[in-house]
Design a protein with these regions (language model features):
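Canonical positions in the second alpha-helix
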Residues: 9, 42-43, 79-80, 114, ...
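Residue at a conserved register position within TPR or TPR-like alpha-solenoid repeats
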Residues: 27, 61-64, 98, 115, ...
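Alpha-helical linker/edge segments of TPR/alpha-solenoid repeat scaffolds
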Residues: 33-38, 65-70, 100-107, 137-141, ...
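Short coil turns that delineate tetratricopeptide repeat
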Residues: 14, 48, 84-85, 102, ...
């Protein structure tokens, strides 16, 4: 029913980005992945570098769950990384896309960044420290992770000094 309503509204208001995004989501969730992907690819051509289009399409691709979908989402989001790096939703979508694409190092980095941006600096620090032990981490990635650890550590130490603890961490 949502698809029919949105399709009717889109016919009445052609070019409305928000209706087109909603229709694409409804198509995907109704099992019409190919039709939804085609709609989103068209929206990307019409609105290159649009955060709403990229984030919505990435979410749909991530829900599809295939390696190819993850690679497509990762490739689509990567150009926006420099301008959207401080957005936890963006980082979560990029992390999931990287995970599906088989890029565990980038996925771990993005999940850690999402944790930090969501107010969980200690979780982010722990994730980054675990990532440093990953043998797949190359020299450049290690330098990136070390720099991020160095920038997050003072925040974590200050929170500990103030007695602020992350309630989600199991402290044994």
């Amino acid at each position: 029913q949502a698809r029919q309503t949105l399709a009717g509204l889109l016919q009445s208001h052609p070019g409305n980005l928000w209706l087109a995004l909603g229709l694409g989501e409804a198509e995907s969730r109704a099992g019409q992945a190919a039709q939804a992907n085609s709609r989103f690819e068209q929206l990307l051509r019409e609105h290159p570098n649009s955060r709403p289009v990229a984030l919505t399409y990435a979410e749909i691709l991530n829900e599809q769950g295939s390696r190819e979908a993850g690679q497509r989402a990762q490739a689509m989001l990567r150009p926006l990384l420099s301008q959207s790096g401080n957005d936890p939703v963006f980082q979560q979508r990029f992390a999931r896309a990287s995970e599906l694409a088989g890029d565990s190092v980038r996925a771990s980095e993005a999940y850690a960044e999402a944790a930090f941006l969501s107010g969980r600096p200690e979780q982010a620090l722990m994730q980054l420290q675990a990532l440093k032990r990953n043998p797949a981490l190359d020299y450049i990635g290690r330098a990136r992770v070390d720099a991020r650890i160095e920038s997050i550590t003072p925040t974590v130490l200050e929170l500990r000094r103030q007695g602020v603890q992350d309630p989600d961490l199991d402290r044994r």
